[in-house]
């Protein structure tokens, strides 16, 4: 596959990831409200779980590496998850004096995302 074609597939994966992030975030607002950045937390945890599954699957040889790592890992998951929005969410919370919510958001994003990635990786390990 040419680099140009691969870039096109990565961009397509990114488009699906960005649209997924938007839809998941909007669903979180509808279900949980705007009092906490649930959407960012949700996409980061889901993306981390999927990254663990992807990387374990690749490392175990369950799927052939080929273009899947950059298409899914860089494109889809790169656009689905978001560190910049996570950062801005915390700045906004702190600007509004919501320091406990900001701390909780930081703790939950880091702890749950790493845990989800670990779980995803372990799920795909060969027994």
Swiss-Prot record:
Disulfide bonds: none
UniProt keyword annotation of S-adenosyl-L-methionine present: no
Regulation: Na(+) is not transported, but it plays an essential structural role and its presence is essential for fluoride channel function.
Cellular localisation: Cell inner membrane
Domain of life: Bacteria
GO MF term list: fluoride channel activity; metal ion binding
Transmembrane segment boundaries: 4-24, 35-55, 71-91, 99-119
NCBIfam families to which the protein is assigned, alphabetical: crcB, PRK14200.1
Name this protein carries in UniProt: Fluoride-specific ion channel FluC
Gene field: fluC
